[in-house]
Amino acid sequence: GGGLLRKFLSFERLIRPDELVDIKRTTNEIEEDFARRPAGGPARPVNLDPGYLALSKVVLATTKDYSHRVYLGKGIYAEVTLHFREGRYEPWEWTYPDYRTEEYGKFFLEVRKCLREALHTRRETPKEEC
């Protein structure tokens, strides 16, 4: 709906893809906690969509099954939302419209640059400007 505020966060600590299940379960608990707040506010005031960025793709976690999603375990599925091709992240036919925008693409390219640096130097955290 209208009036939504969106914010992406990228963390310095690199994760293993198999951590995504527990991360999504934790964000679900956070969403439920916010939903239990006093009445009068939105039914779902916070929507957290964790995922990870790899050099070749952006993966999101979800609790909803669909033909292009892979079951990871504990009720969590993964979706490759974007794939890297010819210098940019490109959408698939199922990619949500907002993930197709130039603004989001720029953000993911910046995060990819930081990830490349972190992987190149074999550190757990990238340079300060990342």
What are these regions (language model features)?
Residues 7-11:
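A generic structural motif
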Residues 2-5, 15-35, 39-129:
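Long, contiguous binding/interaction regions
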